[in-house]
Amino acid sequence: MRPLFADPKTDFVFKKIFGTEEHKSVLIAFLNHLLELGEEHRIVEVHLLPPEQRPKVQELKYSIVDVKCVDARGTIYVVEMQVLNVEGFEKRVVYNVAKAYTSQLDVGQTYPDLNDVIGVTICDFDLWPEGEGPQKEPAVPMLSRWRMQEQHGGARGLGQLQLVFLELRKYDASRPPQTMVEKWAYFFREAPSLKVVPEVLAERPFKEALEAARVALFTDEEWDAYIRAGMAIQDERGALSLARKEALREGRKEGRKEGIEEGKKEGRKEGIEEGKKEGRREGIEEGKKEGMRAAIRGIL
């Protein structure tokens, strides 16, 4: 039985909601909410940038989805959905934002022509899990914003590149969502299991996003693409899990091997030390006996 709403974290559905002219108002509302922009700085219009070398229905690298747009002030936004935590993920996010910044200049343009770039990334995992122990780092909230600032005084003078992360796993599902950010987290996490449009998502941007994800409106081609994307994510998740298990097994084997070698070394070391101690004890005893024999010979 098909669900009422498709998973918005899936490549095809994410771009259907946030990367089309038809639902551009959803993208604008999403950016305004996550960037927590005041009325005077709110985004009122965006222009979707063309995807770079991406086929109509992407069937590779499903865990990475992005949408690029620019607002009326020229600020560029790289909106990305990341399903799986892969090695080098943070570096790739920084690289993509930096690339969007540096690729703005054409021949004849100068540095003042550069516009700010903001990377907005939704993660379906704990990118910064809460640390353990007495030296643990401060907890990073569900919605975090990062930019360059002066190290000692904290002055924020360099805002050309900014990074925003929404970690869905940090959403507290034990209570109804209160803020707009919490409602977006709720939307991303719960949409595939919803049977009706809940009251907390009855406002326009969320309702429109759910309508875009309504499975009954999918064509057969779109449904097939959605199913293939979901299967590809599961395959990728399984491959990562298998790689981790194999690495763990290899680590255990290597650890046992190193442990045995270390044990041999330690055993030899302890044996030598014990031999020295035993030799000293035997030498002392032999010396005492020899001294007594010499004393007796002197008396006789």
Model-found features: residue ranges?
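Elongated, amphipathic alpha-helical interaction scaffolds
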Residues: 1-300
